[in-house]
């Protein structure tokens, strides 16, 4: 039921028909062939720590992957260290349909004692990605997918996204390169300014925290 409610909210935001979104299978034959020959830039926790400790502004983008891994406390700790030890401007960017229910990310961040003044909704934060040194994307797949702006046959076409690709560097934490809820590939994985941090979101973030400390 929660998935259907989420789909309804997404389709309202996209001004699209719910049944069409649910029952239209993603087209991926040519896409899969192209994906198989594309390379990613894979990094380590130390790479991520180095980039963030030397940044002026970091925007953290949590998604369902953070919730599934239970990584909110590690994420809050990472943000705290960056702010206090390295004087980095750290903000959290929340997509309205991130997670499995409205407000899912806000609840988890509040549970981890993240300052609500550091948490911003899509409409209030999107313009800041272009001045961010690092976007730390933790399990937020469809809500950051640039295909929402260009691929007319995509189930997420016209859904507003968080413009993370505008950051100087994108650190994308994900267990694998598998598609998200919408079932489509994310070209961000293969972008020149993206470093993939493959693994469990909680473990990866914990390793970064250890390096930052």
Residue ranges, per PLM feature:
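Structured cytosolic domains appended to multi-pass membrane proteins
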Residues: 36-213
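Membrane-interfacial segments at transmembrane helix termini in multi-pass membrane proteins
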Residues: 1-55
């Amino acid at each position: 039921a929660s998935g259907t409610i989420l789909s309804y909210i997404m389709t309202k935001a996209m001004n699209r028909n719910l049944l069409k979104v649910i029952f239209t299978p993603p087209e991926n034959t040519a896409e899969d062939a192209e994906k198989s020959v594309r390379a990613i830039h894979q990094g380590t926790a130390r790479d991520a720590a180095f980039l963030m400790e030397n940044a002026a502004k970091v925007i953290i983008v949590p998604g369902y992957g953070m919730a599934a891994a239970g990584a909110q406390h590690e994420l809050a700790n990472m943000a705290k260290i960056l702010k206090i030890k390295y004087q980095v401007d750290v903000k959290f960017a929340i997509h309205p349909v991130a997670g499995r229910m409205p407000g899912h990310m806000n609840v988890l961040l509040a549970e981890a004692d993240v300052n609500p003044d550091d948490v911003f909704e899509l409409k209030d934060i999107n313009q800041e990605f272009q001045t961010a040194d690092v976007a730390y994307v933790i399990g937020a797949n469809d809500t950051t997918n640039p295909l929402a702006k260009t691929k007319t046959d995509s189930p997420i076409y016209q859904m507003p996204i968080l413009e993370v690709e505008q950051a100087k560097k994108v650190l994308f934490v994900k267990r694998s390169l598998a598609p998200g809820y919408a079932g489509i590939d994310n070209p961000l994985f293969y972008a020149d300014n993206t470093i993939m941090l493959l693994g469990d979101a909680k473990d990866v973030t914990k390793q970064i925290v250890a390096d930052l400390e």
